[in-house]
């Protein structure tokens, strides 16, 4: 299998899909990455864990509709061109 731009884009799509399907109550809270209401204070930098949780929430919120469209296009292309 050749390493092409399409393969790279497909791998990126799979990674974004993996982040988008993480469920906060079923998976993330079991490993201790649930919602923390008391994170940080005034003038404190957020930690790495809170930044990763913010990234996961942002990807799930912002990328929901574009992921549906891109996944549909990818499925159609795979069905048409194998």
Swiss-Prot record:
Purpose of the protein: Regulator of endoplasmic reticulum secretion that acts as a key determinant of brain size. Required for secretion of extracellular matrix proteins. Required for correct brain development by depositing sufficient extracellular matrix proteins for tissue integrity and the proliferation of neural progenitors. Acts as a regulator of the unfolded protein response (UPR).
Record membrane topology: Multi-pass membrane protein
Record key words, sorted: Endoplasmic reticulum, Membrane, Protein transport, Transmembrane, Transmembrane helix, Transport
Listed transmembrane segments: 2-22, 62-82
Family of this protein: Belongs to the YOS1 family.
Protein name per Swiss-Prot or TrEMBL: Immediate early response 3-interacting protein 1
Any Pfam family hit: Yos1
Upper classification of the organism: Eukaryota, Metazoa, Chordata, Craniata, Vertebrata
Main location, first listed in the record: endoplasmic reticulum
One record GO biological process: positive regulation of extracellular matrix constituent secretion
InterPro entries with a match to the protein in the record: Yos1
Subcellular location: Endoplasmic reticulum membrane
A cellular-component GO term for this protein: COPII-coated ER to Golgi transport vesicle
């Amino acid at each position: 299998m050749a390493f092409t731009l399409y393969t790279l884009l497909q791998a990126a799509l799979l990674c974004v899909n993996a982040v988008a399907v993480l469920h906060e109550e079923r998976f993330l809270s079991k490993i201790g990455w649930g919602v923390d209401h008391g994170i940080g204070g005034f003038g404190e930098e957020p930690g790495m864990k809170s930044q990763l949780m913010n990234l996961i929430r942002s990807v799930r919120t912002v990328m929901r509709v574009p992921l549906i469209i891109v996944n549909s296009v990818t499925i159609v292309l795979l069905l048409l061109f194998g």
